[in-house]
Swiss-Prot record:
GO terms for molecular function: calcium ion binding; metalloendopeptidase activity; zinc ion binding. This is Serralysin. Optimum temperature is 50 degrees Celsius. Active from 10 to 80 degrees Celsius. CDD domains: ZnMc_serralysin_like.
């Protein structure tokens, strides 16, 4: 196993030799990755099985061999009176009011969005798989609790302390701690455990330092954790996730299968959202987003255009983005492709994935990096920098197109361009290719008003070389930052 740096020792990068913008991008590509991000203090080693730790006890409805292609059917009910089997250590039953029922249903929906399960409400609480109720006194000091299921289970209850202000109207809304608590306890009823063997009833209060057994045990990765997101470098500024996060989604799909019917059309997250989910929706510049995107198909967009802060938007699966003034508050579930991103009016960094991305920086001095795939790139207003790290990111048959480039303001940066062993001399402009590695040619099509920028990796120019199209007026060699 790869070893990580010891407690409270920061991890440094290898020395970067590119431009300031290229180095900033390179740093962002490694953000939130323990062992690579120098801002992370590693108190526990990362786990390659972090998601599976949530289902280590094999608690579930149904059996291990059940067909995950078939949707698992469950029922739930809100208790209207004290049940005969009310847990021994609590007293003072109360039923959920309408606002609390609505919030709990939204938490249920957030689980069915990602897993191949279906919940149906029933008024027959005796036969419901999962029940909801309040209490107002506990011999053990309970705040909220739920029962884990088993293949032979007939019912699992969730209970919440009504004396806690957490379950008032304000705190059960989106990003509230009460709403997260509903999502957390429902996670237990579906079979998810805490990331490690700790509980609120422990004699000694659990802490990240003493109780976590691996790095990812924080609320940045899972709603099942007791520990704040700052333990793993992210910062949500006091809000809480209303829906399953990165490792929750992987874990619940391992048990019941994935819901592959969720958001199969072209979906927009953030501003102009069509998700019909409050936690995916931004209404104005003061909105706070916190989510992991699970999306089963379509051509999808992260639209963070209404924010004014400097943002870091990464479209790669299992990555974290800094959106709307928070840190690491938006992530993408494993196996999910989000194709497009729109930045705001700050100085943003937009990072594409292997798909054919559309990236729009918006106002501000942005850094745009398409990665692999034939991308369409817009910098928007401001002094923007388009960074390339290798020829694979824009080969002749999958060329990127850069739009709205302004000569003298915007830059194309190849200062960290990988030319291999034969290209130690870097990238240099020439009139015509001679076959030498690193030769660059700039041409302008006066009819179509398109610039062509190409780099030769050796011998004749071929499919393995680099070629990008820049739309607009003629650009100059001085508009490039070379390796």
């Amino acid at each position: 196993m790869e070893r990580y740096m010891s407690l409270k020792k920061k991890i440094s990068y290898s020395e970067l030799i590119g431009s300031a913008k290229a180095n900033e991008l390179q740093t962002q590509l490694q953000a939130y990755v323990p062992g690579k991000d120098p801002n992370i203090v590693v108190e526990h080693e990362p786990s390659k099985n972090a998601a599976k730790e949530l289902i280590r006890g094999d608690y579930r409805w149904g059996h291990q061999g059940d067909d995950k292609s078939e949707t698992f059917q469950l029922t739930y009910s809100f208790l209207e009176s004290e049940p005969d089997n009310m847990p021994w250590h609590i007293t003072g039953f109360s039923a959920f009011n309408e606002e609390q029922r609505t919030a709990a249903k939204l938490s249920i929906q957030s689980w069915t969005d990602v897993a191949n399960i279906n919940f149906t409400e029933t008024t027959d609480s005796d036969k419901a798989h999962i029940t909801f109720g309040f209490f107002d006194a506990s011999l053990t000091g309970s705040y909220a609790f739920a029962y884990l299921p088993s293949p032979e289970s007939k019912q699992s209850g969730t209970w919440y302390n009504l004396k806690s202000r957490t379950f008032s109207e304000n705190d059960i809304g989106v990003n509230g701690y009460g709403r997260q608590t509903f999502t957390h306890e429902i996670g237990h009823t579906l079979g998810l455990e805490h990331p490690a063997a700790y509980n609120a009833s422990d004699k000694e209060r659990p802490t990240y330092k003493k109780s976590a057994t691996y790095f990812e045990d924080s609320r940045a990765y899972t709603v099942m954790s007791y520990f704040g997101e700052k333990n793993t470098r992210t910062d949500f500024k006091g809000i809480y996730s209303s829906a399953p996060l990165l490792n929750d989604i992987s874990a619940i799909q391992e048990v019941y299968g994935a819901n592959n019917t969720t958001r199969t059309d072209d979906t927009v997250y953030g501003f102009n959202s069509n998700t019909d989910r409050d936690f995916f929706t931004a209404k104005d510049e003061n909105s706070k987003l916190l989510f992991t995107a699970w999306d089963a198909g379509g051509n999808d967009t992260f639209d963070f255009s209404g924010f004014t802060q400097d943002q870091r938007i990464n479209l790669n699966e299992a990555s974290f983005s800094d959106v709307g003034g928070l840190k690491g508050n938006v992530s993408i579930a494993r196996g999910v492709t989000i194709e497009n991103a729109i930045g705001g009016s700050g100085n943003d960094i937009l990072i594409g994935n292997d798909a054919e991305n559309i990236l729009k920086g918006g106002a501000g001095d942005d850094i745009i990096y398409g990665g692999l795939g034939a991308d369409q790139l817009w910098g928007g207003e401001g002094k923007d920098t388009f960074v390339y790290l290798s020829a694979k990111e824009s080969p002749p048959l999958e060329r990127d197109w850069i739009h709205d480039f302004v000569s003298g303001e915007d830059k194309i940066d190849v200062s960290l361009f990988d030319l291999g062993e034969a290209g130690k001399g870097g990238v240099k402009f020439v009139r015509e290719f001679t076959g030498a590695v690193g030769e660059a040619v700039l041409r302008y099509d006066t009819v179509n008003k398109v610039n062509d920028f190409a780099i030769n990796l050796g011998d004749k120019f071929s499919y393995d070389d680099f070629w990008v199209k820049i739309v607009g007026e003629p650009i100059l060699e001085s508009d490039f930052i070379l390796a």
